[in-house]
Regions:
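Basic, low-complexity segments
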Residues: 10-36
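Conserved small/polar residues in nucleotide/adenosyl-binding loops
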Residues: 1-5
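Residue-level marker of regulatory loop/turn positions in helix-turn-helix DNA-binding domains and
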Residues: 7, 11, 42-43
């Protein structure tokens, strides 16, 4: 099967793209998301970034932990469980995550 010349390949979704989009959405710096700050807004943005990385890229928990200041995989598991619980109860969070995923895949 041949491609038409004007068809474009989807841009690969990178960690930087996901963290950048989460950063813009939550008004937090990418360095803070990947860093060790623990204030509520940064922690929320970090959980969203971790969740999206796992869902979109399929990275292992160990790989994700290394990208976020060397966090242990158990910390990543906790973040994912927290996000799953929060998304069940929070329509706005589900919409925010969905919008970020659409933007990083665009």
């Amino acid at each position: 099967m041949y491609k038409r010349q004007n068809e474009t390949q989807p841009v690969p979704v990178t960690i930087e793209k996901i963290v950048g989009e989460v950063s813009r959405t939550f008004n937090v710096s990418p360095a803070d998301i990947r860093g060790t700050k623990r204030n509520a807004n940064v922690a929320s943005a970090r959980r969203v970034a971790i969740y999206i990385l796992r869902e979109v890229t399929g990275m292992s928990m160990e790989e994700i932990g290394r990208e976020f200041s060397g966090r242990d995989h158990s910390t990543i598991v906790y973040s994912l469980k927290t996000m799953e619980r929060d998304m069940k109860n929070d329509q706005h969070l589900r919409e925010t995550v969905s919008d970020i995923i659409k933007n990083v895949k665009a």
